[in-house]
């Protein structure tokens, strides 16, 4: 009898241990739609199908009031902040480009690595400029590297930064070869599944057709007409009118034209499926992670703006691509076995001319010649023949601090002189010394975003905040992003699948809460720079 009791006790202990193991999904899929404004969920809602955005809204949990907690609101920072739960001040990615060691650098450029799959410089990329861990890094650490982490996107930074340092691979599109490539940071040769995918020449198939509207063009009621002075051509020098003869454009411009069509999103989901099959994602003992970024929405948005038929058609096609991808996940991983979230890295402002035509205050902030003007004024004021201002980007003024230090000049006084000049600009709302942000007489909504966005080593010394509806852009047509305003920082945030109950919340949340939420659901440590709070 005693032996039986002992046996039962031991079995109960083992059962307790088994039950104590945290429940996790087989696969986590994070989808970032580049430049997707929150209102796109509803602007085109009536024409969405049941399996894409509507499925996420109907089955999942929608965070209606999710915003970006920093400036500038640009792609590299957005992707970094989503997947790290952090901000530029901490994670180090201060822009798509920023100043590092006195030089302007691309956020993922790395001369210490070589391209894999191409001889293009597009392969000399890595996440080394990212100072913190990502969700995927922490997942790999938590499972003793048993979990697999893969990142895919057309843009290098949109694949590399989400996947993180410890990923099994990150793959991005090379315009020169029309193939997906990687770098020696991850591996010395492409996996066989990537080679197999590249040999299928999906880009050629997509570029062998016309881009025609999905529905009759006169039924696109959420957009302006198809030929307006608000739009650049989908490719510079081409007219912004559908249909587009892609075979002809391909002959003139090469593979890069694919980025500026909705079919770039289709190609991204194609390689996402290939990654799932090639790496057996979602079929392992431990949770795997796939990061996906749809970059074409950003390329199209920049060229034609928020109100274009091309933008509307892109999202209607994206909705179908999402529906197809979710159906694929249901079949391969199993409905209820995967957790997915969808969000954006930033939004986009309405074209200034369009707003002016609606009698809404707007304009292009013209900084042409401003660097030269500032340097001329500073040379006179501080009695030097050296240029003290390096450049203006990310709505920040960057200074030649090494020269200022060498000459023994008062850096604070130099910055104040620049601030005084900028405040005279009719399109500038605020200008301030980044090191004095906390004591500036500006709204808290701006103050905390400027502080979060300021990286002492990589940001400029003076912050510029244009008036609402005003922005810095090379063209009066199309659109851009980067500001603190709702059109740039209010983003969609949807969760669906494993562990998610249907619902919605209008409570304030931030982009940085996404990583905290996913890690809490997986019962793993949050990324080491995470400042977010779990949403549920």
Task: Enumerate the language-model features and the residues they cover.
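Short, structured active-site-proximal loop/turn typified by the sulfatase FGly-forming signature C/S-X-P-X-R
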Residues: 41-90, 148-152
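Bacterial Sec-dependent N-terminal signal peptides
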Residues: 1-24
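Short, solvent-exposed turn/loop segments enriched in Gly/Ser/Thr/Pro and often Arg
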Residues: 63-83, 151-161, 293-295, 339, ...
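Beta-strand elements within well-structured catalytic alpha/beta cores of enzymes
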Residues: 25-37, 56, 82, 139, ...
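Substrate-binding rim/cap in mid-to-C-terminal beta-strand-loop elements of soluble/periplasmic
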Residues: 369-409, 480-522
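Secreted, luminal/periplasmic, and some membrane-associated catalytic domains
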Residues: 48, 65, 74, 96-124, ...
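His/Asp/Glu-rich, glycine-adjacent segments
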Residues: 87, 95-286, 295-302, 423-426
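Second-shell loop/turn segments in exported
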Residues: 37-43, 68, 121-127, 255-262, ...
């Amino acid at each position: 009898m005693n032996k039986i009791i002992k046996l039962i006790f031991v079995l109960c202990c083992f059962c307790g241990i088994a039950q104590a193991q945290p429940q996790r999904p087989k696969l986590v899929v994070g989808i970032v739609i580049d430049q997707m404004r929150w209102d796109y969920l509803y602007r085109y809602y009536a024409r969405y199908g049941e399996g894409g955005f509507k499925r996420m809204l109907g089955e999942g949990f929608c965070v209606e009031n999710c915003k970006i907690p920093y400036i500038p609101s640009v792609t590299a920072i957005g992707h970094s902040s989503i997947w790290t739960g952090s901000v530029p001040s901490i994670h180090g990615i201060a822009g798509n480009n920023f100043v590092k060691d006195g030089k302007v650098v691309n956020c993922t450029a790395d001369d210490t690595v070589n391209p894999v799959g191409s001889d293009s410089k597009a392969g000399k990329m890595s996440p080394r400029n990212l100072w913190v861990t990502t969700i995927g890094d922490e997942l790999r650490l938590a499972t003793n590297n048993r979990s697999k982490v893969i990142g895919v996107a057309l843009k290098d930074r949109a694949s590399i930064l989400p996947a993180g340092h410890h990923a099994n691979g990150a793959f991005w599109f090379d315009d020169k070869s029309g193939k997906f490539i990687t770098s020696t940071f991850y591996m010395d040769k492409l996996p066989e599944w990537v080679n197999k995918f590249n040999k299928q020449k999906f880009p050629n198939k997509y570029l062998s057709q016309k881009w025609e509207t999905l529905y009759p063009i006169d039924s696109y009621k959420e957009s302006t007409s198809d030929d307006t002075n608000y739009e650049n051509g989908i490719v510079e020098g081409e007219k912004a009118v559908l249909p587009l003869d892609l075979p002809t454009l391909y002959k003139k411009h090469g593979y890069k034209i694919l980025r500026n069509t909705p079919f770039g999103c289709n190609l991204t989901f194609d390689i996402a499926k290939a990654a799932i099959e090639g790496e057996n994602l979602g079929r392992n003992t431990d949770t795997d992670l796939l990061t996906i970024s749809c970059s074409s929405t950003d390329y199209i948005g920049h060229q034609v703006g928020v109100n274009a038929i091309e933008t509307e058609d892109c999202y209607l096609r994206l909705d179908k691509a999402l529906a197809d991808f979710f159906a694929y996940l249901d079949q391969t991983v199993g409905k209820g076995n995967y957790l997915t979230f969808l969000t954006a890295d930033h939004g986009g402002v309405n074209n200034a001319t369009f707003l002016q035509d609606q009698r809404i205050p707007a304009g292009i902030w013209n900084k042409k010649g401003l660097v030269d003007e500032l340097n001329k004024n500073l040379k006179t004021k501080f009695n030097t023949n050296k240029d003290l201002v390096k450049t203006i980007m990310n709505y920040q003024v960057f200074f030649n601090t090494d020269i200022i230090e060498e000459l023994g000049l008062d850096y604070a006084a130099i910055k104040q002189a620049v601030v005084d000049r900028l405040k005279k600009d009719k399109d500038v709302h605020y200008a301030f010394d980044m090191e004095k942000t906390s004591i500036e007489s500006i709204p808290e909504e701006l103050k905390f975003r400027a502080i979060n966005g300021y990286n002492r080593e990589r940001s400029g010394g003076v912050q510029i905040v244009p008036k609402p509806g005003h922005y810095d852009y090379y063209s009066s047509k199309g659109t851009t992003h980067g500001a603190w305003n709702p059109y740039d920082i209010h983003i969609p945030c949807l969760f669906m699948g494993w562990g998610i109950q249907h619902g919605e919340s209008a409570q304030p949340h931030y982009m940085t809460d996404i990583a905290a939420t996913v890690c809490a659901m997986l019962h793993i440590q949050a990324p080491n720079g995470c400042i977010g709070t779990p949403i549920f």
